[in-house]
Amino acid sequence: MHFGSPNLTCNRKILDGVISGLSNYGNCVGVPTVSSEITFADCYERNPVVNAMAVGYTNKKVFTSKPSKKGSVYYVGAKTGRDGIGGAMMASEQFTGDEGIKRPTVQVGDPYLEKLLIEASLELFETGAVIASQDMGAAGLTSSTTEIALKGNMGMLIHISKIPLREENMEPWEI
């Protein structure tokens, strides 16, 4: 994790929020925060970089993201909202300092739903009924559908009108 000086109130607030969010979310999902590293530098003023990952192991292969045959596509998880839109794009931007404070584009997570989804997915994978599975990633449906279609060397037809929405009147590009 890389932050601006913790002596500035705005940076301290961001730092405290990130640490709280990581520990609370991981705890609710049942994945402990084992290790972290924090550095401070002026280039991260108001625009921190936080990389996180979860690592696990299994003694057997229970899922794949490469479909071996054609099948139906199911969207499983929380309803889609506008939160997080532009997050991946903003993470790649360069900041000159003239922009002011960038509005956060953080996705709203639900660790309790995620825990249930993880457990249900693992049970479903065990049945052999799932052809392939792909996480949403930073670009949501755009990345997950494209990645799984590419890995399977096939096309995909998505009916975005059937995607469960958390907000009304969302434009197709927002979904």
Predicted stretch roles:
Residues 1-175:
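Glycine/proline-enriched, intrinsically flexible loops and inter-domain linkers
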